[in-house]
């Protein structure tokens, strides 16, 4: 009887652990970190009501018809890392975005290089997709797009960006 309880207990433990291991993004911890990152970006005027603007350039799916990309360093939770902020607009003309960027902003996609060991398989990048108001976008299953987004999947942030040696298509700059 003890053996049966042990087998049932182990089986339930494994069954409960598999779904948890399968989801490597969108956790409460990811959402909290994304909120801290948003606050840091607001302070740096990269997002929010006082954001600075650049000149948009032509983009491609999944990001948008027009984009603005900013590269900098930021400190979140005591760690300083490379921060890449991409504002996704469209489908509109450049003059429309320049004339009223907030009206045409669809999303803000961000890569932040976290501390060594966060996700060594993918160069320690933290991925997040915000809606214009700073809330987290969600995938069709309702999972927040923050953290190791779509790690191990055939499509998604990591799958696409792993096609470039440093995961950054828009620049050949060093991000160490």
Go through each PLM region and give its residues.
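Signals and flexible motifs at protein termini associated with secretion
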Residues: 16-24
């Amino acid at each position: 009887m003890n053996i049966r309880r042990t087998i049932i207990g182990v089986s339930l433990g494994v069954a409960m652990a598999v779904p948890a291991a399968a989801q490597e993004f969108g956790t409460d911890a990811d959402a909290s970190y994304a909120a801290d990152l948003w606050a840091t970006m607001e302070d740096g005027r990269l997002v929010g009501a006082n954001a600075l603007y650049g000149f948009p350039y032509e983009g491609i799916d999944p990001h948008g018809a027009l984009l603005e990309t900013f590269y900098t360093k930021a400190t979140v939770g005591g760690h300083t890392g490379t921060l890449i902020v991409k504002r996704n607009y469209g489908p509109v003309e450049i003059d429309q975005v320049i004339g009223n960027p907030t009206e045409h902003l669809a999303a803000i996609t961000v890569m932040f290089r976290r501390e060594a060991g966060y996700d060594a398989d993918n160069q320690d990048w933290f991925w997040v997709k915000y809606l214009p108001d700073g809330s987290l976008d969600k995938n069709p299953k309702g999972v927040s797009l923050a953290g190791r987004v779509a790690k191990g999947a055939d499509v998604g942030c990591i799958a696409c960006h792993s096609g470039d040696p440093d995961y950054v298509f828009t620049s050949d700059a060093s991000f160490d």
